[in-house]
């Protein structure tokens, strides 16, 4: 039996119960998403860590009977072992999902959207600092650090992290990237709308003389000086801006252009959580044109652990 045929076994079994679960598993066995992202997506769909663990165990048993020793069987076992190793974190994430504090519904106004983000992240960070900024971390500091390291490596490959770089992290969350980047840049500034996130970031960055963390008002980059940064990054923050209204996205991109120096880059990692890549690309190109950016990259997926999508804009 070929590897592709092996992988069809758990996908078909899941499809009998739920086509969405089948699609998640298909993407995993086809190598499109990592094991942590797969478990995150299963948790989002099922909102029950025990149910996810049971489904994964059943899948492994089926694979042992039909395709023991195959590549697909080993991949299934990897998923099972990851679930076991992070059972407490997965249960915490399932609890967070069941609490129904988050919502994918577009806000009725920018004001409502900003208030929603403040409430959501003030609450989330108190449940799990790691999961509050990356559900795919499964609440694990180690997994989150691996994902963070991947981002830092990519920023360095793009030439955006040097000893002379003044960097801005838009939606800095708990400050994980500020901590990782501080030894590699001249100065790093983080801004976030959530007071509780800012507290966590300030605590994690305590003792780092070249890091500043500030609470923003959510309406833009108010208070940051013109032409004061060489690079700005936004990791999983633009989806919430977009959910709050396109006008807010326009404001942030225009503000990024204002605070960046000439040839400085705005790196957006995930612009939205939509599956509509064409719409994302069209919007980003329009935003770039109206705010004085050139488009460097649209839609890249360079990460192994995380399924983040890259959008890079360079200030003219």
Where do the model's predicted regions map?
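N-terminal accessory regions of S-adenosyl-L-methionine
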Residues: 2-148
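Class I S-adenosyl-L-methionine
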Residues: 293-316
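Conserved beta-strand signature within the Rossmann-like core of class I S-adenosyl-L-methionine
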Residues: 263-270
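A short SAM/SAH-binding and catalytic strip from SAM-dependent methyltransferases
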Residues: 231-246
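A short acidic, Gly/Pro-enriched loop at the edge of an enzyme's catalytic core
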Residues: 222-232
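Conserved alpha-helix/loop element of class I SAM-dependent methyltransferases that forms part
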Residues: 145-163
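A short glycine-rich, Lys/Arg-flanked "PGG" loop and its adjoining helix->strand segment in the class I
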Residues: 249-262
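Class I SAM-dependent methyltransferase SAM/SAH-binding core
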Residues: 168, 174-220
């Amino acid at each position: 039996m070929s590897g592709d045929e092996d992988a069809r076994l758990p996908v078909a079994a899941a499809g009998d119960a739920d086509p969405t679960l089948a699609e998640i598993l298909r993407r995993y066995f086809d190598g499109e998403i990592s094991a942590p992202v797969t478990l995150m997506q299963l948790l989002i769909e099922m909102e029950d860590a025990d149910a996810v663990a049971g489904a994964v165990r059943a899948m492994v048993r089926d694979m042992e009977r039909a395709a023991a020793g195959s590549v697909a069987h080993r991949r299934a076992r990897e998923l099972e072992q990851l679930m076991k190793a992070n059972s407490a974190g997965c249960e915490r994430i399932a609890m967070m999902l069941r609490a129904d504090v988050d919502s994918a519904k577009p806000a009725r106004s920018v004001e409502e959207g900003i208030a929603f983000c403040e409430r959501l992240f003030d609450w989330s960070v108190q449940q799990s600092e790691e999961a509050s900024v990356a559900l795919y971390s499964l609440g694990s500091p180690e997994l989150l650090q691996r994902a963070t390291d991947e981002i830092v490596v990519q920023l360095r490959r793009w030439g955006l992290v040097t000893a002379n770089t003044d960097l801005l992290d838009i939606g800095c969350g708990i400050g994980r990237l500020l901590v990782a980047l501080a030894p590699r840049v001249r100065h790093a500034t983080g801004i976030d709308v959530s007071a509780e996130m800012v507290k966590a970031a300030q605590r994690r960055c305590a003792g780092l003389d070249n890091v500043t963390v500030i609470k923003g008002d959510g309406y833009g980059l108010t208070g940051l000086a013109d032409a004061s940064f060489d690079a700005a990054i936004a990791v999983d923050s633009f989806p919430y801006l977009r959910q709050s209204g396109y006008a807010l996205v326009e404001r942030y991109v225009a503000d990024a252009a204002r605070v960046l120096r000439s040839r400085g880059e705005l790196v957006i990692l995930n612009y939205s959580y939509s599956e509509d890549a064409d719409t994302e690309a069209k919007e980003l190109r329009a935003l770039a044109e109206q705010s004085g950016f050139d488009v460097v990259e649209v839609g890249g997926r360079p990460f192994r652990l995380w399924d983040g999508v890259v959008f890079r804009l360079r200030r003219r």
